[in-house]
Design a protein with these regions (language model features):
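Bacterial N-terminal signal peptides
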Residues: 1-4
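Cleavable N-terminal signal peptides
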Residues: 7-8
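Extracellular, repeat-based ectodomains that mediate carbohydrate processing or recognition
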Residues: 12-472, 476
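Short, solvent-exposed mixed-charge patches
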Residues: 478-480
Length: 480
């Protein structure tokens, strides 16, 4: 049974016949927030996950991203897949078009409204379209392993959706609501759940209950959560906003092995949710006492199922972009006895982002925008591949994946159960001004390919990014 059991065409929010429209190529959204961050944000923000899922039974990597209408700043939730047998991608499917909403023009390009996805036990693709302090949407594919047509399942207040499929147990969804501040919740939907049951979103579990206190509690402005799943375990790493500034700091971790009925810290000790104060057993490290900001990038598990968190630190009060102190990429790893902290490298922007891989043979990798790009100090840069062979204690840059780029590359995302041929996905975009945005992926060795921006047929083969750069260097699209 799948999540979709019990759904009828009449219960869904879209007509029962026909296919969703498609685009004639892969164009990412360009987005900015008051100069705080800007660029090609098709895979933004870091607290959205997952963006891609590999399913071996059909040898396809399904993925979503924030697309756009070429020449406009109009966000569309897109879904597609990479066919590993044929080495091709289809035209991407438009699942949700924010241009058809009643949002203000500036909100129609808001990268916070990007989608995430999950593939259920029957192979149906579910797309979770984020709101931003308002309603989001959930869509499900009509056919297993097919992204041609979707039905809307529900509309509900939902920001930063993180859906995870737990084998033989169902869906676990982390998400955020902006009731008082940024408050984190979870929701479970076992196999066979009907729409009527799925609609009981008014009683989700609550992970934190920070509120803005009258006395200006410096920790009381909510949090961001970054999640992962392995087997029956779900986990969340969190930071929190500090006072009425834009600083965010501290590092928290919680996990559950029973779909949220009980929660534990990394050492297995019970923890009663929600978190109500920063100084609690879930706090890994009080970075604010060290006057450091914390920007979490990715949460994963090592080969023994122990959590590892990739994050960046910057001096308190320091602007996200521009000259200043170092932005230090750091790995926090639970060794089984304690949290160990290991620096990796430094970069130029608080919102630089990568993915952490802890492989079964003991190799750890980071793929991310750690190198200076063509728009220095802006979000992203050039992409590099780093490796560690001592559980993240020391790191070496193995390979630079992009170089001489026209735009910064940003938000490198790891697929669930990543196939070696489709190991990371990201986008580029001008960090200074609106521009076109292309989508890229690489294999485990770091060879980069670019998704086609213009398609004349139903399928196309992604080009080598190096070959594309050489052939298009004289005719690259300018800023729009």
């Amino acid at each position: 049974m799948s999540l979709a059991a019990g759904l009828s065409a009449a219960e869904s929010g879209t007509p029962p016949a026909g296919k969703n429209p498609t685009a004639d190529g892969y164009d990412g959204i360009w987005y900015t927030s008051r100069g705080y961050y800007s660029g090609g944000f098709a895979l933004f923000p870091s607290q959205h996950s997952p963006f891609a899922v590999y399913r071996g039974e059909v040898q396809k990597t399904f993925f979503v991203y924030g697309g756009t209408v070429r020449g406009k700043r109009q966000l569309q939730a897109m879904v597609s897949y990479y066919d590993h047998q044929r080495g091709v991608v289809p035209r991407p499917t438009i699942v949700h078009d924010w241009g058809e909403s009643n949002l203000k023009p500036g909100q129609m390009a808001d990268g916070h409204r990007n989608p995430t996805l999950v593939v259920d036990g029957d192979g149906r693709v579910w797309v979770f379209v984020s709101g931003h302090g308002d309603n989001g949407y959930v869509y499900r594919a009509r056919k297993p392993y097919c992204v041609e047509s979707f039905d809307r399942v529900i509309e509900t207040p939902m920001t930063y959706p993180n859906p995870w499929w737990i084998p033989n147990r169902g869906l676990f969804l982390f998400f955020t609501k902006y009731d008082h501040s940024r408050e984190s919740f979870w929701l479970t939907c076992p196999d066979g759940m009907s729409l009527a049951d799925l609609a009981t979103w008014h009683t989700p579990g609550e992970l934190n209950a920070w509120t803005i206190s009258p006395d200006g509690d410096k920790y009381g402005h909510g949090n961001y959560q970054f999640t992962a799943a392995r087997g029956s375990r779900v986990a969340t790493a969190m930071n929190n906003w500090i006072g009425r500034t834009r600083d965010r700091s501290n590092l928290f971790y919680l996990q559950s092995d029973d779909l949220g009925r009980t929660w534990q810290t990394a050492d297995g000790k019970p923890f009663s949710v929600p978190i109500r104060t920063a100084h609690c057993a879930a706090l890994i490290r009080d970075f604010w006492s060290e006057q450091l900001q914390v920007y979490i990038q990715h949460l994963t598990f090592d080969s023994q199922g122990r959590p590892a968190i990739l994050f960046l630190t910057a001096s308190a009060g320091q602007a996200a972009e521009g000259p200043g102190g170092p932005k230090t990429w750091t790995v926090a790893h639970w060794t089984g006895e304690r949290w160990a902290f290991h620096p990796v490298t430094t970069s130029l922007n608080n919102f630089d982002c990568g993915s952490l891989y802890a492989e079964d043979d003991g190799t750890w990798r980071i793929i991310g925008s750690t190198l200076r790009g063509p728009q220095p100090w802006k979000t992203g840069g050039e992409i590099a591949l780093w490796t560690s062979h001592d559980q993240g204690a020391t790191w070496k840059m193995l390979k630079q994946l992009t170089a001489g780029s026209l735009y910064n590359h940003s938000y490198v995302r790891q697929p669930v159960d990543a196939h070696p041929d489709f190991y990371a996905l990201w986008a580029d975009g001008d960090g200074d001004k609106p521009s076109p945005s292309r989508l890229y992926f690489c294999n485990r060795a770091g060879d980069v390919r670019i998704l086609p921006q213009a398609m004349t047929g139903s399928f196309a083969q992604p080009e080598s990014a190096a070959a594309w750069s050489s052939s298009k260097s004289a005719s690259r699209p300018g800023s729009g």
